[in-house]
């Protein structure tokens, strides 16, 4: 399941720990300027889509991510790679290297990962 940019912002918070609506609002307001109502709307949609779940304790809802982080990241990466580079990993890495976006340490790490079995 592909996530929207807004869904990524919320689920990244929830992968760290379960949060209440007020905690999410505080965590996201500085970065996004979203109101409590905007976050409620997004959370309701995410619950319907199975991205987020919640447990009600009295009047408080505790929201948690319902999807696996690694699977979501892999799906997003694969989609980006296919859409932008036609699935060509070499072209992606070549473009990153040419744009000076990779540090020497990152290049060494990439080399180590490629050489692993």
Question: What do the PLM-derived regions correspond to, one by one?
Answer:
Residues 5-12, 91:
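Pre-recognition alpha-helix immediately N-terminal to the DNA-recognition helix
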Residues 16-20:
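Short capping segments at the starts of secondary-structure elements
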């Amino acid at each position: 399941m592909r996530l929207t940019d807004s869904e990524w912002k919320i689920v990244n918070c929830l992968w760290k720990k379960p949060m209440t609506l007020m905690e999410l609002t505080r965590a996201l307001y500085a970065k996004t300027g979203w109101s409590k109502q905007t976050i409620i709307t997004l959370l309701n949609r995410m619950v319907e889509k199975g991205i987020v779940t919640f447990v009600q304790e009295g009047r408080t809802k505790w929201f948690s991510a319902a999807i696996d982080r690694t699977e979501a990241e892999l799906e997003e990466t694969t989609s980006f790679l296919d859409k932008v580079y036609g699935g060509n990993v070499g072209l992606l890495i070549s473009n990153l290297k040419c744009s000076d976006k990779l540090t020497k340490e990152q290049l060494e790490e990439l080399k180590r990962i490629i050489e692993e079995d």
